[in-house]
Amino acid sequence: MGDNQILVPLKIDLHISSDALDSYLLDLIHAAEEYITTEGITLDPNNFGDRLLVEMYAAHLYRSRRDTGDKSKMPRMLRWALNNRLFSQKISEG
């Protein structure tokens, strides 16, 4: 996927203006892509929704790295987005 197309909105979402964490954030983006594909979702790098899904997942990984308990759980919005994306893919595959 276009890493910069995901990195810029991720940094905005996380309120990060410095480039100091770019390498770490790119690692989170790649991890998010891998985690999403293990759920059976085929990501399309040209699909804005898929890029946003990766960004949301990477933001969750960043935020949950220091949280414990309920705060480290995946947000419902993200779980629903993943489920909706997978169901949409399965329907289009027939």
Task: Name these PLM-found stretches.
Residues 1-53, 85-94:
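Conserved short "hinge" loops at termini or chain/domain junctions
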Residues 41-42, 67-69:
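Short, structured secondary-structure boundary patches
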Residues 46-47, 58-67:
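Mid-chain, well-packed structural core segment of small domains
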Residues 53, 57, 77:
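Broad gene-expression machinery/nucleic-acid interaction feature
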Residues 68-94:
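Protruding loop/beta-arch "assembly-hinge" segments enriched in small, turn-prone residues
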